[in-house]
Amino acid sequence: MNSYQPKSLLNELQYYITPPHGCSYLDNKSARMVFLDPVHRIDVVTLSELSRMGFRRSGDFVYRPECHLCRQCLSSRVPVQLFKMNSKQKKAWKRNQDLQLKISRPQDATDVHYALYERYINERHADGDMYPPSRDQFEKFLIHSCTDSFFLELWKDDRLISVSTCDPLDDGLSAVYTFFDPDENRRSLGVFAILKQIEHAKNLDLQYIYLGYWVPHSNKMNYKSDYIPLELLLDGQWRRLNRALTAEEIAQLGDSLMTTLPSGWNSPIIK
């Protein structure tokens, strides 16, 4: 009997590229995106292959930056079986042991989920391109999906305080977006949400958590480099960062990526 092998749809998909537009991460820079035709629903096998090639999902769109003279959007992933918490992460873990984890489907989201999302955007991202929030935006961004996404929810008794949207992959989980109660600053919920996703991937015996793009010249994205070891898709290959970079090293890496040429960045700390 022949064993069933899942078939990738990679070669059957139609790709498009956007015109230049303002970069969401770097001031005074333009960006372009390659994206899949959103009319096609893709399976886990295909999304997994695309993730290993540096693609991300947002709502029904699966995309990858394709920018002129800039390659700073580095896809990042954490090898969860090797991950070790730093002191800050250990404190966040200990501080949130009173929370309960629940798993749900985005399609089952209620007014409670939207109210938390609305407060989060209003109070944490009022200067971003997702402000002002709306129900339509919430549904297109987090409820609509071209794959079988799920929510990892954190509850304090009967109060929802954090939601992480995840995509299942054949080698891990893709961390799509997290929103949480902005009044719970002491808890470091953003940190704890990533730690819970790492734990969930470990429990499923998966290899990676895909954290999305790390942009060295964007301070708001530098938190991703706190999760060590961290693998970066650099010059077409996944390379491992085994310790946290200094601010100077981050700046040097960012400078080397302001070109379409291979970075040639051969620091021994990235293997």
Tell me the role of every PLM-derived stretch:
Residues 56-70, 75-186, 226, 271:
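A conserved beta-strand-loop-helix scaffold within acyl/acetyltransferase catalytic domains
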Residues 51, 122, 202:
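Short polybasic/polar patches that bind polyanions
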Residues 186-198:
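Conserved acetyl-CoA-binding loop-helix of GNAT-fold acetyltransferases
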Residues 173, 177, 181-187, 204-217:
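Nucleic-acid nuclease catalytic cores
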Residues 195-207:
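Conserved acyl-CoA
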Residues 117, 194-197, 224:
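Residue-level preference for non-acidic, small/hydrophobic
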Residues 1-103, 208-271:
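Terminal substrate-recognition subdomain of acyl/acetyltransferases
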